Protein backbone atom coordinates (compact mmCIF):
# COMPACT_ATOMS: atom_id res chain seq x y z
CA UNK A 1 0.00 0.00 0.00
CA UNK A 2 1.72 3.16 -1.23
CA UNK A 3 2.35 6.14 1.00
CA UNK A 4 1.38 9.38 -0.70
CA UNK A 5 3.93 12.12 -0.24
CA UNK A 6 2.27 14.98 1.68
CA UNK A 7 2.65 18.55 0.44
CA UNK A 8 5.60 20.46 1.98
CA UNK A 9 6.77 17.19 3.57
CA UNK A 10 10.36 17.18 4.79
CA UNK A 11 12.18 14.03 5.81
CA UNK A 12 14.71 14.46 8.59
CA UNK A 13 17.64 12.15 9.22
CA UNK A 14 16.85 11.58 12.86
CA UNK A 15 13.26 10.43 12.61
CA UNK A 16 12.56 7.38 14.69
CA UNK A 17 10.43 4.46 13.62
CA UNK A 18 10.88 2.09 16.49
CA UNK A 19 7.70 0.03 16.86
CA UNK A 20 6.61 -0.86 20.37
CA UNK A 21 7.42 -4.36 21.49
CA UNK A 22 4.48 -6.66 22.08
CA UNK A 23 4.01 -9.64 24.32
CA UNK A 24 3.16 -12.77 22.37
CA UNK A 25 2.01 -16.01 23.89
CA UNK A 26 3.96 -19.06 22.75
CA UNK A 27 1.88 -22.14 21.96
CA UNK A 28 2.41 -24.76 24.67
CA UNK A 29 4.93 -27.47 23.83
CA UNK A 30 3.66 -31.04 23.99
CA UNK A 31 5.08 -32.96 26.90
CA UNK A 32 6.92 -36.21 26.13
CA UNK A 33 4.72 -39.23 26.64
CA UNK A 34 5.59 -41.33 29.68
CA UNK A 35 4.14 -44.41 31.36
CA UNK A 36 4.72 -47.13 33.95
CA UNK A 37 5.12 -50.81 33.09
CA UNK A 38 2.99 -52.87 35.46
CA UNK A 39 3.92 -56.54 35.95
CA UNK A 40 1.64 -59.23 37.41
CA UNK A 41 2.04 -59.93 41.10
CA UNK A 42 3.54 -63.30 41.95
CA UNK A 43 0.72 -65.68 42.61
CA UNK A 44 -1.66 -63.90 40.20
CA UNK A 45 -2.44 -64.93 36.71
CA UNK A 46 -2.10 -62.52 33.82
CA UNK A 47 -5.83 -62.16 33.91
CA UNK A 48 -5.59 -60.84 37.48
CA UNK A 49 -7.16 -63.91 39.23
CA UNK A 50 -5.39 -65.69 42.14
CA UNK A 51 -3.90 -69.07 41.33
CA UNK A 52 -5.58 -71.90 43.26
CA UNK A 53 -3.03 -73.28 45.71
CA UNK A 54 -5.35 -76.22 46.51
CA UNK A 55 -5.57 -77.28 42.88
CA UNK A 56 -4.47 -80.92 42.55
CA UNK A 57 -0.92 -81.19 41.18
CA UNK A 58 -0.12 -77.57 41.81
CA UNK A 59 3.51 -76.87 42.64
CA UNK A 60 4.10 -74.59 45.61
CA UNK A 61 7.12 -72.40 44.94
CA UNK A 62 8.50 -69.36 46.67
CA UNK A 63 9.34 -66.23 44.75
CA UNK A 64 12.54 -66.78 42.84
CA UNK A 65 12.66 -70.53 43.77
CA UNK A 66 14.29 -72.79 41.18
CA UNK A 67 12.11 -75.59 39.88
CA UNK A 68 13.15 -79.14 39.13
CA UNK A 69 14.06 -78.18 35.58
CA UNK A 70 16.57 -75.63 36.92
CA UNK A 71 14.81 -72.70 35.29
CA UNK A 72 13.14 -69.71 36.92
CA UNK A 73 9.45 -69.38 36.34
CA UNK A 74 8.87 -66.97 33.49
CA UNK A 75 5.63 -65.28 32.68
CA UNK A 76 4.41 -64.59 29.23
CA UNK A 77 4.52 -60.97 28.18
CA UNK A 78 1.87 -59.63 25.89
CA UNK A 79 3.28 -58.17 22.72
CA UNK A 80 2.47 -54.48 22.47
CA UNK A 81 1.09 -53.38 19.16
CA UNK A 82 3.04 -50.56 17.63
CA UNK A 83 0.95 -47.45 17.25
CA UNK A 84 1.01 -45.72 13.91
CA UNK A 85 2.21 -42.29 14.97
CA UNK A 86 2.53 -40.93 11.45
CA UNK A 87 0.07 -38.08 10.98
CA UNK A 88 -1.81 -37.72 7.75
CA UNK A 89 -0.53 -34.81 5.70
CA UNK A 90 -3.10 -32.06 5.25
CA UNK A 91 -2.93 -30.23 1.94
CA UNK A 92 -4.27 -26.82 1.01
CA UNK A 93 -7.55 -26.68 -0.88
CA UNK A 94 -8.45 -24.75 -4.01
CA UNK A 95 -9.50 -22.04 -3.30
CA UNK A 96 -7.29 -21.91 -0.19
CA UNK A 97 -9.54 -22.16 2.85
CA UNK A 98 -7.65 -24.49 5.24
CA UNK A 99 -6.16 -22.56 8.16
CA UNK A 100 -2.35 -22.66 8.10
CA UNK A 101 -2.35 -23.85 11.72
CA UNK A 102 -3.83 -27.14 10.47
CA UNK A 103 -1.15 -27.55 7.78
CA UNK A 104 1.89 -26.39 9.74
CA UNK A 105 1.30 -28.48 12.87
CA UNK A 106 4.50 -27.24 14.53
CA UNK A 107 3.39 -23.62 14.03
CA UNK A 108 6.78 -22.88 12.45
CA UNK A 109 6.52 -21.17 9.10
CA UNK A 110 9.05 -21.16 6.24
CA UNK A 111 11.74 -18.56 5.83
CA UNK A 112 11.53 -16.29 2.82
CA UNK A 113 14.42 -15.03 0.68
CA UNK A 114 17.51 -14.51 2.85
CA UNK A 115 20.09 -12.06 1.49
CA UNK A 116 23.41 -11.67 3.29
CA UNK A 117 24.65 -8.11 3.70
CA UNK A 118 27.54 -7.01 1.52
CA UNK A 119 30.91 -7.04 3.29
CA UNK A 120 31.88 -3.71 1.76
CA UNK A 121 29.20 -1.77 3.66
CA UNK A 122 30.69 1.68 4.21
CA UNK A 123 29.29 2.09 7.74
CA UNK A 124 29.07 -1.23 9.54
CA UNK A 125 30.55 0.31 12.71
CA UNK A 126 27.58 2.00 14.31
CA UNK A 127 28.01 3.98 17.49
CA UNK A 128 27.02 2.67 20.88
CA UNK A 129 24.36 5.38 21.16
CA UNK A 130 22.64 4.22 17.98
CA UNK A 131 22.80 0.61 19.12
CA UNK A 132 21.17 1.52 22.42
CA UNK A 133 18.52 3.57 20.64
CA UNK A 134 17.50 0.55 18.60
CA UNK A 135 17.83 -2.00 21.39
CA UNK A 136 14.07 -2.12 21.93
CA UNK A 137 13.51 -2.74 18.23
CA UNK A 138 16.04 -5.56 18.11
CA UNK A 139 14.64 -7.15 21.25
CA UNK A 140 11.24 -7.19 19.57
CA UNK A 141 12.70 -8.98 16.53
CA UNK A 142 12.66 -12.36 18.30
CA UNK A 143 11.44 -15.80 17.24
CA UNK A 144 7.79 -14.85 17.77
CA UNK A 145 8.25 -11.72 15.67
CA UNK A 146 9.79 -13.72 12.82
CA UNK A 147 7.23 -16.50 13.03
CA UNK A 148 4.32 -14.04 12.93
CA UNK A 149 5.84 -12.37 9.87
CA UNK A 150 6.52 -15.69 8.15
CA UNK A 151 2.98 -16.88 8.78
CA UNK A 152 1.53 -13.65 7.36
CA UNK A 153 3.82 -13.99 4.33
CA UNK A 154 2.82 -17.61 3.74
CA UNK A 155 -0.86 -16.61 3.85
CA UNK A 156 -0.15 -13.86 1.31
CA UNK A 157 1.68 -16.26 -1.03
CA UNK A 158 -1.00 -18.94 -0.96
CA UNK A 159 -3.87 -16.50 -1.47
CA UNK A 160 -2.24 -14.54 -4.29
CA UNK A 161 -1.10 -17.67 -6.13
CA UNK A 162 -4.70 -18.85 -6.18
CA UNK A 163 -6.24 -15.54 -7.26
CA UNK A 164 -3.76 -15.32 -10.14
CA UNK A 165 -5.50 -18.38 -11.59
CA UNK A 166 -8.96 -16.79 -11.50
CA UNK A 167 -8.09 -13.26 -12.64
CA UNK A 168 -9.26 -13.24 -16.24
CA UNK A 169 -11.11 -10.80 -18.48
CA UNK A 170 -14.78 -10.83 -17.51
CA UNK A 171 -14.35 -11.17 -13.75
CA UNK A 172 -16.07 -8.52 -11.62
CA UNK A 173 -13.81 -6.69 -9.18
CA UNK A 174 -16.56 -6.94 -6.56
CA UNK A 175 -16.18 -10.72 -6.85
CA UNK A 176 -12.37 -10.67 -6.78
CA UNK A 177 -11.97 -8.66 -3.56
CA UNK A 178 -13.95 -11.13 -1.38
CA UNK A 179 -11.99 -14.04 -2.90
CA UNK A 180 -8.80 -12.47 -1.58
CA UNK A 181 -10.16 -11.37 1.77
CA UNK A 182 -12.07 -14.58 2.51
CA UNK A 183 -8.91 -16.53 1.74
CA UNK A 184 -6.84 -14.43 4.15
CA UNK A 185 -9.39 -14.83 6.93
CA UNK A 186 -9.69 -18.58 6.37
CA UNK A 187 -5.93 -19.20 6.36
CA UNK A 188 -5.30 -17.09 9.45
CA UNK A 189 -8.34 -18.74 11.09
CA UNK A 190 -9.70 -15.35 12.16
CA UNK A 191 -12.96 -14.33 10.51
CA UNK A 192 -12.99 -10.96 12.27
CA UNK A 193 -16.68 -11.07 13.15
CA UNK A 194 -16.25 -11.20 16.92
CA UNK A 195 -15.11 -8.06 18.71
CA UNK A 196 -11.33 -7.78 18.55
CA UNK A 197 -10.83 -10.88 16.41
CA UNK A 198 -9.61 -8.91 13.37
CA UNK A 199 -6.83 -7.45 15.54
CA UNK A 200 -5.37 -10.92 16.13
CA UNK A 201 -4.83 -11.73 12.45
CA UNK A 202 -6.38 -11.06 9.05
CA UNK A 203 -6.50 -8.20 6.58
CA UNK A 204 -4.03 -5.38 7.22
CA UNK A 205 -5.87 -3.00 4.88
CA UNK A 206 -8.60 -3.24 2.21
CA UNK A 207 -7.69 -5.04 -1.00
CA UNK A 208 -6.57 -2.57 -3.65
CA UNK A 209 -7.79 -3.39 -7.18
CA UNK A 210 -6.67 -0.51 -9.38
CA UNK A 211 -7.21 -0.37 -13.14
CA UNK A 212 -5.11 1.47 -15.72
CA UNK A 213 -4.53 5.12 -14.70
CA UNK A 214 -5.82 4.48 -11.16
CA UNK A 215 -2.51 3.91 -9.41
CA UNK A 216 -3.51 3.12 -5.83
CA UNK A 217 -6.20 3.15 -3.14
CA UNK A 218 -9.28 1.86 -4.97
CA UNK A 219 -11.45 -0.97 -3.69
CA UNK A 220 -15.03 -2.08 -4.45
CA UNK A 221 -17.43 -0.49 -1.98
CA UNK A 222 -21.16 -1.00 -1.38
CA UNK A 223 -23.35 0.86 -3.85
CA UNK A 224 -20.54 1.55 -6.34
CA UNK A 225 -20.87 0.85 -10.05
CA UNK A 226 -19.80 -2.67 -11.03
CA UNK A 227 -16.39 -2.84 -12.72
CA UNK A 228 -15.61 -5.74 -15.08
CA UNK A 229 -12.00 -6.58 -16.00
CA UNK A 230 -11.25 -6.20 -19.72
CA UNK A 231 -8.54 -7.69 -21.95
CA UNK A 232 -6.80 -4.33 -22.44
CA UNK A 233 -6.78 -3.44 -18.73
CA UNK A 234 -3.73 -3.21 -16.47
CA UNK A 235 -4.76 -4.44 -13.00
CA UNK A 236 -2.78 -3.80 -9.82
CA UNK A 237 -3.54 -6.14 -6.88
CA UNK A 238 -2.32 -4.78 -3.54
CA UNK A 239 -3.29 -6.42 -0.25
CA UNK A 240 -1.81 -6.83 3.21
CA UNK A 241 -1.90 -9.62 5.78
CA UNK A 242 -1.13 -9.23 9.46
CA UNK A 243 -0.55 -11.65 12.33
CA UNK A 244 -0.51 -10.00 15.76
CA UNK A 245 0.01 -6.63 14.08
CA UNK A 246 3.03 -7.75 12.01
CA UNK A 247 2.08 -6.54 8.54
CA UNK A 248 3.16 -8.03 5.21
CA UNK A 249 2.47 -5.58 2.37
CA UNK A 250 2.94 -6.92 -1.15
CA UNK A 251 1.53 -6.09 -4.59
CA UNK A 252 1.73 -7.22 -8.20
CA UNK A 253 0.34 -6.24 -11.60
CA UNK A 254 -1.43 -8.37 -14.22
CA UNK A 255 -2.08 -7.56 -17.87
CA UNK A 256 -3.35 -9.79 -20.67
CA UNK A 257 -2.36 -7.73 -23.71
CA UNK A 258 1.39 -8.26 -24.36
CA UNK A 259 1.84 -4.60 -25.35
CA UNK A 260 2.16 -3.86 -21.62
CA UNK A 261 4.93 -6.41 -21.01
CA UNK A 262 7.69 -3.79 -20.92
CA UNK A 263 5.73 -1.64 -18.48
CA UNK A 264 5.39 -4.55 -16.05
CA UNK A 265 9.03 -5.57 -16.56
CA UNK A 266 10.22 -2.03 -15.84
CA UNK A 267 8.38 -1.83 -12.53
CA UNK A 268 9.28 -5.35 -11.41
CA UNK A 269 12.98 -4.76 -12.17
CA UNK A 270 12.89 -1.39 -10.41
CA UNK A 271 11.39 -2.97 -7.30
CA UNK A 272 14.07 -5.66 -7.31
CA UNK A 273 16.73 -2.96 -7.69
CA UNK A 274 15.36 -1.25 -4.59
CA UNK A 275 15.37 -4.53 -2.68
CA UNK A 276 18.95 -5.19 -3.74
CA UNK A 277 20.13 -1.82 -2.41
CA UNK A 278 18.10 -1.97 0.81
CA UNK A 279 19.95 -2.85 4.00
CA UNK A 280 21.31 -1.60 7.30
CA UNK A 281 22.76 1.91 6.88
CA UNK A 282 21.71 2.08 3.21
CA UNK A 283 21.14 5.66 2.11
CA UNK A 284 17.55 6.17 1.02
CA UNK A 285 18.71 8.72 -1.57
CA UNK A 286 20.92 6.05 -3.14
CA UNK A 287 18.07 3.51 -3.21
CA UNK A 288 15.73 6.04 -4.86
CA UNK A 289 18.31 6.87 -7.51
CA UNK A 290 18.84 3.18 -8.31
CA UNK A 291 15.08 2.62 -8.64
CA UNK A 292 14.63 5.53 -11.04
CA UNK A 293 17.63 4.54 -13.17
CA UNK A 294 16.28 1.04 -13.75
CA UNK A 295 12.65 2.12 -14.19
CA UNK A 296 13.34 4.81 -16.76
CA UNK A 297 15.61 2.63 -18.88
CA UNK A 298 12.43 1.04 -20.28
CA UNK A 299 9.95 2.21 -22.88
CA UNK A 300 6.71 0.82 -24.27
CA UNK A 301 5.03 1.07 -27.66
CA UNK A 302 1.33 1.90 -27.52
CA UNK A 303 -0.69 2.70 -30.64
CA UNK A 304 2.54 2.83 -32.69
CA UNK A 305 3.96 5.45 -30.38
CA UNK A 306 7.04 4.84 -28.24
CA UNK A 307 6.48 6.06 -24.68
CA UNK A 308 9.12 6.15 -21.93
CA UNK A 309 8.22 4.54 -18.61
CA UNK A 310 8.38 7.17 -15.87
CA UNK A 311 8.80 6.67 -12.14
CA UNK A 312 5.84 8.16 -10.25
CA UNK A 313 7.05 11.17 -8.28
CA UNK A 314 4.58 11.70 -5.43
CA UNK A 315 3.97 8.26 -3.96
CA UNK A 316 6.61 6.29 -2.08
CA UNK A 317 7.64 3.09 -0.41
CA UNK A 318 7.60 3.25 3.38
CA UNK A 319 8.59 1.61 6.60
CA UNK A 320 6.00 -0.45 8.47
CA UNK A 321 5.33 -0.22 12.19
CA UNK A 322 3.39 -2.44 14.58
CA UNK A 323 -0.28 -2.29 13.50
CA UNK A 324 0.59 0.70 11.25
CA UNK A 325 1.03 0.28 7.52
CA UNK A 326 2.81 3.65 7.12
CA UNK A 327 5.69 4.68 9.37
CA UNK A 328 7.70 7.90 9.24
CA UNK A 329 10.31 6.90 6.64
CA UNK A 330 9.70 7.08 2.91
CA UNK A 331 11.51 5.61 -0.10
CA UNK A 332 10.79 7.72 -3.21
CA UNK A 333 11.10 6.28 -6.73
CA UNK A 334 12.99 9.30 -8.03
CA UNK A 335 16.34 10.80 -7.09
CA UNK A 336 15.97 12.81 -3.91
CA UNK A 337 18.15 14.65 -1.42
CA UNK A 338 17.91 13.25 2.09
CA UNK A 339 20.43 12.09 4.69
CA UNK A 340 18.05 9.47 6.01
CA UNK A 341 19.26 5.88 6.18
CA UNK A 342 17.69 2.52 6.77
CA UNK A 343 18.41 1.09 10.20
CA UNK A 344 18.82 -2.28 11.84
CA UNK A 345 15.44 -3.63 12.89
CA UNK A 346 13.48 -1.65 10.29
CA UNK A 347 10.69 -3.24 8.25
CA UNK A 348 10.20 -1.67 4.82
CA UNK A 349 7.66 -1.99 2.03
CA UNK A 350 9.82 -1.55 -1.07
CA UNK A 351 7.42 -0.75 -3.88
CA UNK A 352 7.57 1.09 -7.17
CA UNK A 353 5.01 2.59 -9.54
CA UNK A 354 5.77 3.21 -13.20
CA UNK A 355 3.52 5.20 -15.53
CA UNK A 356 3.03 6.01 -19.21
CA UNK A 357 1.36 9.29 -18.18
CA UNK A 358 2.70 12.35 -16.39
CA UNK A 359 3.77 10.20 -13.39
CA UNK A 360 2.13 12.53 -10.89
CA UNK A 361 -0.94 11.39 -8.96
CA UNK A 362 -4.00 13.38 -7.93
CA UNK A 363 -6.83 12.53 -5.56
CA UNK A 364 -9.93 11.20 -7.30
CA UNK A 365 -13.50 11.27 -6.02
CA UNK A 366 -14.62 8.58 -3.63
CA UNK A 367 -13.16 6.97 -0.52
CA UNK A 368 -10.92 3.90 -0.50
CA UNK A 369 -10.72 3.47 3.26
CA UNK A 370 -10.23 4.98 6.69
CA UNK A 371 -7.59 4.87 9.40
CA UNK A 372 -7.82 5.83 13.07
CA UNK A 373 -5.22 8.32 14.36
CA UNK A 374 -4.38 7.21 17.90
CA UNK A 375 -2.69 10.55 18.62
CA UNK A 376 -5.80 12.60 17.85
CA UNK A 377 -7.96 14.36 20.45
CA UNK A 378 -11.63 13.54 20.94
CA UNK A 379 -12.46 16.70 22.90
CA UNK A 380 -14.46 18.18 20.01
CA UNK A 381 -16.50 15.04 19.44
CA UNK A 382 -20.12 15.58 20.50
CA UNK A 383 -22.29 13.34 18.28
CA UNK A 384 -23.30 10.12 20.02
CA UNK A 385 -23.24 8.31 16.67
CA UNK A 386 -19.62 9.35 16.15
CA UNK A 387 -18.63 8.21 19.64
CA UNK A 388 -20.31 4.85 19.14
CA UNK A 389 -18.65 4.40 15.74
CA UNK A 390 -15.24 5.31 17.15
CA UNK A 391 -15.65 2.65 19.84
CA UNK A 392 -16.39 0.06 17.14
CA UNK A 393 -13.36 1.17 15.12
CA UNK A 394 -10.99 0.98 18.09
CA UNK A 395 -12.25 -2.44 19.18
CA UNK A 396 -12.16 -4.06 15.74
CA UNK A 397 -9.48 -2.29 13.68
CA UNK A 398 -7.32 -0.20 16.00
CA UNK A 399 -4.90 1.67 13.72
CA UNK A 400 -5.36 -0.75 10.80
CA UNK A 401 -6.91 0.75 7.66
CA UNK A 402 -10.46 -0.46 6.96
CA UNK A 403 -13.20 0.14 4.40
CA UNK A 404 -16.97 0.58 4.37
CA UNK A 405 -17.28 -3.09 3.38
CA UNK A 406 -15.54 -4.07 6.61
CA UNK A 407 -17.93 -1.98 8.72
CA UNK A 408 -21.02 -3.38 7.03
CA UNK A 409 -19.65 -6.91 7.39
CA UNK A 410 -19.78 -6.31 11.16
CA UNK A 411 -23.41 -5.24 10.87
CA UNK A 412 -22.75 -1.53 11.40
CA UNK A 413 -25.55 0.59 9.92
CA UNK A 414 -26.22 4.30 9.42
CA UNK A 415 -22.61 5.22 10.10
CA UNK A 416 -22.15 7.95 7.46
CA UNK A 417 -22.92 10.94 9.72
CA UNK A 418 -20.71 9.60 12.49
CA UNK A 419 -17.86 8.92 10.06
CA UNK A 420 -18.12 12.42 8.62
CA UNK A 421 -17.78 13.83 12.14
CA UNK A 422 -14.73 11.65 12.88
CA UNK A 423 -13.01 12.72 9.66
CA UNK A 424 -13.85 16.41 10.18
CA UNK A 425 -12.37 16.32 13.69
CA UNK A 426 -9.17 14.66 12.45
CA UNK A 427 -9.76 11.52 14.50
CA UNK A 428 -10.06 9.31 11.43
CA UNK A 429 -8.16 9.88 8.19
CA UNK A 430 -9.81 9.10 4.88
CA UNK A 431 -7.92 7.83 1.82
CA UNK A 432 -8.98 8.79 -1.69
CA UNK A 433 -8.06 6.89 -4.89
CA UNK A 434 -4.86 8.19 -6.54
CA UNK A 435 -4.93 8.63 -10.31
CA UNK A 436 -2.70 9.65 -13.20
CA UNK A 437 -4.05 11.35 -16.33
CA UNK A 438 -6.85 9.53 -18.22
CA UNK A 439 -5.56 7.24 -20.95
CA UNK A 440 -2.34 6.42 -19.11
CA UNK A 441 -1.33 3.10 -17.58
CA UNK A 442 0.33 2.52 -14.21
CA UNK A 443 1.95 -0.69 -12.92
CA UNK A 444 3.08 -1.62 -9.39
CA UNK A 445 5.21 -4.28 -7.69
CA UNK A 446 5.95 -4.44 -3.98
CA UNK A 447 7.66 -6.59 -1.34
CA UNK A 448 8.16 -6.38 2.42
CA UNK A 449 11.73 -6.73 3.69
CA UNK A 450 12.96 -7.25 7.26
CA UNK A 451 16.36 -5.70 8.09
CA UNK A 452 17.61 -8.33 10.51
CA UNK A 453 20.98 -7.91 12.29
CA UNK A 454 22.87 -10.38 10.08
CA UNK A 455 20.80 -10.44 6.90
CA UNK A 456 17.76 -9.00 5.19
CA UNK A 457 14.74 -11.23 4.66
CA UNK A 458 12.49 -10.43 1.72
CA UNK A 459 9.62 -11.90 3.66
CA UNK A 460 6.95 -11.77 0.93
CA UNK A 461 9.12 -13.24 -1.86
CA UNK A 462 7.54 -16.16 -3.73
CA UNK A 463 7.96 -18.20 -6.88
CA UNK A 464 5.61 -15.85 -8.72
CA UNK A 465 7.50 -12.57 -8.17
From Swiss-Prot:
Cofactor note (record):
Binds 2 divalent metal cations per subunit. Has a high-affinity and a low affinity metal-binding site. The true nature of the physiological cofactor is under debate. The enzyme is active with cobalt, zinc, manganese or divalent iron ions. Most likely, methionine aminopeptidases function as mononuclear Fe(2+)-metalloproteases under physiological conditions, and the catalytically relevant metal-binding site has been assigned to the histidine-containing high-affinity site.
* Keyword terms of this UniProt record: Aminopeptidase, Cytoplasm, Hydrolase, Metal-binding, Protease
- Look up the record and give one Gene Ontology term from the biological process aspect: proteolysis
Q: Where, by residue number, does a divalent metal cation 2 bind? A: 249, 318, 351, 446
Q: Which InterPro entries match?
A: Creatinase/aminopeptidase-like (IPR036005), Met_Aminopeptidase_Type2 (IPR050247), Pept_M24 (IPR000994), Pept_M24_MAP (IPR001714), Pept_M24A_MAP2 (IPR002468), Pept_M24A_MAP2_BS (IPR018349), WH-like_DNA-bd_sf (IPR036388), WH_DNA-bd_sf (IPR036390)
UniProt GO MF annotations: initiator methionyl aminopeptidase activity; metal ion binding; metalloaminopeptidase activity
Q: Where is the composition biased (Acidic residues)?
A: 43-54
Indicate yes or no for the key word Nuclease.
no
Per UniProt, subcellular location reads as:
Cytoplasm
Recorded catalytic activity of this chain's protein: Release of N-terminal amino acids, preferentially methionine, from peptides and arylamides
Where does the chain bind a divalent metal cation 1?
A: 238, 249, 446
- Main subcellular location: cytoplasm
Q: Where is the composition biased (Basic residues)?
A: 1-11, 73-84
What cofactors does this protein use?
Co(2+); Zn(2+); Mn(2+); Fe(2+)
Pfam families in the record: Peptidase_M24
Binding locations of substrate: 217, 326
Cite a GO CC annotation: cytoplasm
EC number of this enzyme: 3.4.11.18
Q: In which domain of life is the source organism classified? A: Eukaryota
- Region annotated Disordered sits at 1-89
The record's similarity note reads: Belongs to the peptidase M24A family. Methionine aminopeptidase eukaryotic type 2 subfamily.
- What does this protein do, in the record's words? Cotranslationally removes the N-terminal methionine from nascent proteins. The N-terminal methionine is often cleaved when the second residue in the primary sequence is small and uncharged (Met-Ala-, Cys, Gly, Pro, Ser, Thr, or Val).
- PANTHER family according to UniProt: METHIONINE AMINOPEPTIDASE 2, METHIONINE AMINOPEPTIDASE 2-2
What is the name of the protein in this document? Methionine aminopeptidase 2-2
Which species is this UniProt entry from?
A: Ajellomyces capsulatus (strain G186AR / H82 / ATCC MYA-2454 / RMSCC 2432)
Amino acid sequence: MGSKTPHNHRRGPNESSSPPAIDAINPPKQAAASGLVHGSLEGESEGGEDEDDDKPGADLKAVGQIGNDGQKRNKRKKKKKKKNTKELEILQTTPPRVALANIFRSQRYPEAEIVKYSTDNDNLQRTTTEELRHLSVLNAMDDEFLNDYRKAAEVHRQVRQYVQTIIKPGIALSQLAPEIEDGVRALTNHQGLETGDALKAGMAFPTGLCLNNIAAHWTPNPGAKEVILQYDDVLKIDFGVHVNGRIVDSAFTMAFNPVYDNLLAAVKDATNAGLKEAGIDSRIAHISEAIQEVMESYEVELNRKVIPVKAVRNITGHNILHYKIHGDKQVPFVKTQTNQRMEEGDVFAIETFGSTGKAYLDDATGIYGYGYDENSSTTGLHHSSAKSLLKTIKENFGTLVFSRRYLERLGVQRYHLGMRSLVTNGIVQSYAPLVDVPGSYVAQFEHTVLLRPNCKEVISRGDDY
